[in-house]
Amino acid sequence: KLEALSGRPCLVRRYCDTSLEELRGLGIRALLISGNAAEFSEYGDHAFDELHRIVRAAEWPIIGFCGGHQQIAAAYGAEIGPMRSLRPGEPDITDVSAPGYLKEWGFTPVSVVQDDPILAGLGPAPVFLEVHYCEAKQLPFGFRLLASTPDCRVQLMRREDRPVYGAQFHPEGYTEWPFDTRNELVNLVYPAGHARAEPAGKRLLENFFRVAGILV
């Protein structure tokens, strides 16, 4: 999807297996930091040091999704942790991950709190795919808050002086027609399919590629 949207090849690198110098040598135009299936605690103590160095250098337009968003926040000093434990009697909406914790799970409207080019054409409450129980506990210093939900304040943020974005949701998990099964993450959340088209993530990604100068 990312190659089709951007019209450019997308090179895949693991969080811990790349360096700022390698990225400079590759001549990349933008950096997209994905979510993660493993818990952050399963990585080594310094596994993200180089990723944080890359993010702080901000030599290219950057966007992080879900866990990638959380690592951008961590690179700038924010605490990362679970939203909260479930209260007594509060139902757990899924047993797929993190039993006992509050989760945002499924297509969810987010409330735009500040305009930005990445949100062009999306209205005041675009719907994006959420699949998480952890969050950035604070907005990092030097960032602007762009969107929130009642359960997770830092849903979308941008560095004030550079096009460095973090999205707690998954913009890549969009659908273009009812029961669109082309995205594995959507299929995980909706095994029987999702009955509506939810294309806001596509628009946000296109907007990011425009901010990055990749799309006109």
Residue spans for each PLM region:
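Local cysteine-cluster metal-coordination motifs and their immediate loop/turn environment
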Residues: Q71-I72
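Flexible gly/pro-rich beta->alpha loop and the following alpha-helix that scaffold active-site loops
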Residues: L2-G64, Y76
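A SAM-dependent methyltransferase catalytic signature shared across enzymes that methylate proteins
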Residues: G7, P140-L146, R210-G213
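Acyltransferase
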Residues: E172-V216
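Glycine-rich, phosphate-binding/catalytic loops in enzymes
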Residues: A47-H52, E79-P82, L146-S148, N183-L185
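Pocket-forming structural segment of enzyme catalytic cores
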Residues: G77-Y165, F169-Y174
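Alpha-helical elements of Rossmann-like donor-binding domains used by nucleotide-donor carbohydrate transfer enzymes
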Residues: E50, R144, R203-N207
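Conserved H-loop
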Residues: G67
